[in-house]
Swiss-Prot record:
Residue(s) carrying N6-acetyllysine: K28
Binding site for Fe cation: H571, D573, H673
KW Metal-binding (keyword) present: yes
Lineage of producing organism: Eukaryota, Metazoa, Chordata, Craniata, Vertebrata
Record region (Disordered): 15-124, 145-222, 242-272, 697-719, 827-846
Organism whose genome encodes this protein: Homo sapiens
Residues binding 2-oxoglutarate, per UniProt: T568, Y665
Modification N-acetylalanine, positions: A2
Bias type Basic and acidic residues, positions: 183-211, 836-846
Any GO molecular function: dioxygenase activity
Biased composition (Basic residues): 156-172, 250-271
Protein name, as recorded: Lysine-specific demethylase RSBN1L
Keywords: Acetylation, Dioxygenase, Iron, Isopeptide bond, Metal-binding, Nucleus, Oxidoreductase, Phosphoprotein, Ubl conjugation
């Protein structure tokens, strides 16, 4: 409630020319007689952020009626709590001692003193009184000089204090005083501040602090996951930045909520994302990287060839060497490049390291090799092929592919050659737009190709593969010895054919090859109009109703053209079946289809993606390869740029390669590759079982003589005649850590080798055979007494010394080797599991 008008106001106005007699204590307001307290309080309330709900003193028109004399009334208690003292310094008209000491004080709860009531009888001039509401708006010329000076001095003393209080409230410096009940004086009146608003401000500050803490925690967690550590400052200057950070936090949270569709299907976590980010960021030192890898040794295993000195290949990493990039997956090209220093023809070998994929490819160019003599060309071929197929200590090739550009120029056009020399040879060709296959002759297929050929592609179905070493069962093809002789004229192909000098097979005839060569023709990927497609399944008749409603039919209701995809999805070349299936190397020759057009430059025929051999298992897992399927159906998805980038982020290395006309290419084992035919091409390809891949199985052996007989099994002609009587011996083995992976891959049966039988025994008596020590990669066994009869095989006794690490594999092997009767499932695969460099030393009793 507002207090009643007090006669003190009239006392303050009674002395118009008074001077200030005393100074109030620090913090008190000095008022002139011309300035009623009601007007001052009204002015104060407007300037102070409107804290008080209502004014305590001088409300309404009390300032204007201050000159009216009213008897003092008992004041009501203040609405804001405890009473506070009022103090005035009235101005006197003359410097008399009574007027100089006329300052008085009284509390809000006491009556007016008698001395004050006596002074109330003095008349008040009307011209000196100004309405309180217009006092602050009066011009200075209307006031007396003394009053104007006093008002200006009073205003000057009041403004700095208001500014200080506003600054305290703004910066929060006066919060503690306000919360503790400290009051501010106004017009000589004690006016406490509202507590509920102070509490609200304190709560808002606490909430802001908690929000900042939460933001810091969230940002720190996000940056720790991203490998960044950044401390945010809490100063007031960075408040506008917090809005941007809030948006970033929301974006990151939204990205986390979104899951990749492929990850939702597989529900497999990323295995390499965090480790690759950490190491690729350069946070690990070179020493830590070596310890983490555990792969990089001082010596690098080199290819063992006839003309290569392996002693010169022991390249060690210098201790003070600095590598600009350290990664768990990246190969250090410096080590591989040092291997070229000891090569005879290193200036003719070009190594391409692809920065996007991280894998390396070896190139050689026939125009640079033209000055070599035939003997030098043979040495270069062995050196180049040995470098392409060389492997590290993990049996993974250093390079994903080796290419000799233009090396097949001496060969004739394959399609022209076979259509002219073997016109009636049957072939199988596909029909464009259909999955049907029709059988035709080589000359008829060549005629279709020639009729539809234009600028690098033809519009006829592709020709399926035919065998060049004889057809078996449902295969198509024949034996073409003259063409095979032309292939052997190349030093690169002579050593890498299935029966070549680097092969572990010793074939009596080229017809016995189960690894090719094969030949096929592809038209190239293209868009084909529907009208040009024979018997197109997309073509349909329009009914009468459709003809009437043509205006409503969209133009895309019928396909105008169709994409013919000429692609071979990702696969790895394998030999063998079942548990004996294992990866092997591949060789290919490309001859573009020209049909009389001979361009000056070789045409691009294939786009190839090859993955590094060391990432074989990861590629199989990521791309869901079924390695027991044929090459065309091992993978169900096509690897495009987006998939390549995803795999690269997970540390998988690859190379993107373009193959040209007349190129010969070599692909090491465990290299997953996919091909896309970009122009019409005739291809040759075959598998090669290198001695390098089976060199650890070659040991010197003593043979036991057996009786020979004839065999009706045509598939075993590689090994020679077989009979029903066999004597099988299990060799004594020493453990080799290099082939421990074969134990886990169930390749135990590959170590049982089958050889031709020397003689046939007529007696049915058991024969005791003493077998010396031999080295394989399975386990330690002593074959002491082996009993054999004409129709079955019996093992008398075994003494097995097992290592605890290979106990399970030995048990499985014993069950497979000792069933009482030994059945040979695939003799061709067994023969391929070893090399026969010295036939006498390699004979095994089977």
């Amino acid at each position: 409630m507002a207090e009643p008008p007090s006669p003190v106001h009239c006392v303050a106005a009674a002395a118009p020319t008074a001077t200030v007699s005393e100074k109030e204590p620090f913090g008190k307001l000095q008022l002139s007689s011309r300035d009623p307290p009601g007007s001052l309080s009204a002015k104060k309330v407007r300037t102070e952020e409107k804290k008080a709900p209502r004014r305590v003193n001088g409300e309404g028109g009390s300032g204007g009626n201050s000159r009216q004399l009213q008897p003092p009334a008992a004041p009501s208690p203040q609405s804001y709590g405890s009473p506070a003292s009022w103090s005035f310094a009235p101005l006197s008209a003359a410097p008399s001692p009574s007027s100089s000491r006329s300052s008085f004080s009284f509390s809000a709860g006491t009556a007016v003193p008698s001395s004050a009531s006596a002074s109330l009888s003095q008349p008040v001039p009307r011209k000196l009184l100004v309405p309180p509401t217009l006092l602050h708006a009066q011009p200075h010329h209307l006031l007396l000089p003394a009053a104007a000076a006093a008002a200006s001095a009073n205003a000057k003393s009041r403004r700095p204090k208001e500014k200080r209080e506003k600054e305290r409230r703004r910066h929060g410096l006066g919060g503690a005083r306000e919360a503790g009940g400290a009051s501010r004086e106004e017009n000589g009146e004690v006016k406490p501040l509202p507590r509920d608003k102070i509490k609200d401000k304190i709560k808002e500050r606490d909430k802001e602090k908690e929000r900042e803490k939460k933001k810091h925690k969230v940002m720190n967690e996000i940056k720790k996951e991203n490998g960044e550590v950044k401390i945010l400052l809490k100063s007031g200057k960075e408040k506008p930045k917090t809005n941007i950070e809030d948006l970033q936090i929301k974006k990151v949270k939204k990205k986390k909520k979104k899951k990749h569709k492929e990850n939702e299907k597989r529900k497999r976590p990323k295995m390499y994302s965090k480790s690759i980010q950490t190491i690729c960021s350069g946070l690990l030192t070179d020493v830590e990287d070596q310890a983490a890898k555990g792969i990089l040794n001082d010596n690098i295993k080199d290819y063992v060839g006839k003309n290569l000195d392996t002693k010169n290949y022991d390249s060690k990493i210098p201790e003070n060497s600095e590598f600009p990039f350290v990664s768990l997956k990246e190969p250090r090209v410096q080590n591989n490049l040092k291997r070229l220093d000891t090569l005879e023809f290193k200036q003719l070998i070009h190594i391409e390291h692809q920065p996007n994929g991280g894998a390396s490819v070896i190139h050689a160019y026939s125009n640079e090799l033209s000055h070599l003599s035939p003997m030098e060309m043979e040495r270069f071929a062995e050196e180049f092929v040995g470098l392409v197929f060389s492997e590290n200590e993990n049996s993974a090739a250093f390079y994903v592919m080796g290419i000799v550009h233009g090396a097949a120029t001496y060969l004739p056009d394959f399609l022209d050659y076979f259509s002219f020399n073997f016109p009636n040879s049957p072939v199988k060709m596909e029909i464009l737009g259909k999955k049907d296959i029709e059988t035709t002759t080589m000359s008829n297929f060549h005629a279709q190709v020639k009729r539809t050929y234009s600028h690098g592609t033809y519009r006829a179905g592709p020709m399926r593969q035919i065998s060049l070493v004889g057809a078996v069962d449902e295969e198509v093809g024949d034996y073409f010895p003259e063409f095979l002789d032309m292939l052997e004229e190349s030093p690169f192909l002579k050593c890498t054919l299935p029966w070549g000098t680097l092969s572990s097979l010793k074939l009596q005839s080229r017809k016995d090859s189960d690894d090719g060569p094969i030949m096929w023709v592809r038209p190239g990927e293209q868009m084909i109009p529907v009208a040009d497609m024979p018997k197109s399944p997309f073509k349909r008749k329009r009914t009468t109703n459709e003809i009437k409603n043509l205006q409503y039919l969209p133009r895309t209701s019928e396909p105008r053209e169709m994409l013919f995809e000429d692609r071979t999805r990702a696969h790895a070349d394998h030999i063998g079946q079942g548990f004996e299936r294992q990866t092997t190397a591949a060789v290919g020759v490309l001859k573009a289809v020209h049909c009389g057009e001979w361009p000056d430059q070789p045409r691009i025929t294939k786009d190839v993606i090859c993955f590094h051999a060391e990432d074989f298992l990861e590629v199989v897992q990521r791309m869901q390869l079924d390695l027991h399927e044929p090459p065309l159906s091992q993978c169900v998805q096509w690897v495009d740029d987006a998939k390549l980038n995803q795999l690269r982020r997970e540390g998988i290395r690859y190379a993107r390669i373009q193959l040209y006309d007349n190129d010969i290419y070599f692909i090491p084992r465990n290299v997953v590759h996919q091909f896309k035919t970009v122009s019409a091409v005739c291809s040759l390809a075959w598998h090669i079982r290198l001695k390098l891949y089976h060199s650890e199985e070659d040991t010197s052996q003593n043979t036991a003589t057996h009786e020979t007989g004839t065999s009706s099994d045509s598939t075993s002609s590689v090994l020679g005649p077989h009979t029903d009587n066999m004597i099988c011996a299990v060799s004594k083995a020493s453990l080799d850590s290099v082939f421990s992976d074969k134990l886990h891959s169930k390749y135990e049966l590959q170590q049982i080798k089958h050889e031709p039988i020397a003689s046939v025994r007529i007696k049915e008596e058991p024969v005791n055979v003493n077998i010396p020590e031999k080295t394989t990669a399975l386990n330690n066994m002593d074959g002491k007494n082996v009993k054999a009869k004409l129709d079955h095989v019996q093992f008398a006794e075994f003494k097995i010394d097992m290592d605890s690490k290979f106990e399970n594999s030995n048990k499985d092997l014993k069950e497979e080797l000792c069933p009482g009767n030994l059945s040979l499932v695939d003799t061709r695969q067994h023969s391929s599991a070893h090399s026969n460099q010295d036939k006498k030393d390699d004979d095994i009793l089977c």
